[in-house]
UniProtKB/Swiss-Prot annotation:
It comes from Staphylococcus aureus (strain MRSA252). InterPro entries: MrpF/PhaF-like (IPR007208). It is found in: Cell membrane. The lineage of its organism: Bacteria, Bacillati, Bacillota, Bacilli, Bacillales. May form a heterooligomeric complex that consists of seven subunits: mnhA2, mnhB2, mnhC2, mnhD2, mnhE2, mnhF2 and mnhG2. Belongs to the CPA3 antiporters (TC 2.A.63) subunit F family. The chain crosses the membrane at residues 5-25, 38-60, 70-92. Keywords: Antiport, Cell membrane, Ion transport, Membrane, Transmembrane, Transmembrane helix, Transport. This is Putative antiporter subunit mnhF2. Signal peptide: none annotated.
Amino acid sequence: MIQTITHIMIISSLIIFGIALIICLFRLIKGPTTADRVVTFDTTSAVVMSIVGVLSVLMGTVSFLDSIMLIAIISFVSSVSISRFIGGGYVFNGNNKRNL
């Protein structure tokens, strides 16, 4: 009985995450500004990590956890890169002055 309830909850969470992924991909394509697309990309990567985690629980394996870490690292690096691109490539020094 408990296994059936757990299985139903896992399947329903996959459906909800799938709907969230479709909404995020729509906003990623439609987003009017680059900042909207960056936020949507971060949200999409979080949803994908959640889907992979739920699939890991469903299959009863921990081998997918490495791919979750890889998605998180790629998401972080891309967010920092795009943020730097939006900022014009400037970085801050200790005096709060911008340098190239």
